[in-house]
Amino acid sequence: MLFLACECPYLDELDRAQLRKTTSSHLTADMLTGLWQCYYPMYVGNVEFKEVRMFSSGKADIIMEDVGGSAYYAETFKWRWDGNYITFTKGNTTYQFQVTDCIFPELFLSDSRRKYPWAWRRPEDCIK
């Protein structure tokens, strides 16, 4: 994936914010809305999370791929932030990740299996 420079009014603020290390207790749901993408393969159960778009309405679209690459698809989940954990639920399926570190706009998540680095991805109108 290639990111090129673009003119977005809040990019300077994001650049300054990126230098600020914070704890999960300083994160708000508003800071979590938007499009997130995993730096490295994020295998959760039998799927790989590719990216997650979290909406302020409490819904999240998760783009995932079956392990082995046999299917690539998106599913809509409900999401919530309790100050320590991001939880995605759909029917009987629940994914829960603890925010172990944050250097905004980067998040580091973990579950019982491993740690996952995520990074903020710019809005589509800033991606060329």
Language-model-detected regions and their locations in the chain:
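Lipid interaction determinants
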Residues: 7-74, 80-128
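C-terminal motif of bacterial Sec signal peptides marking the signal peptidase cleavage site
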Residues: 2-5
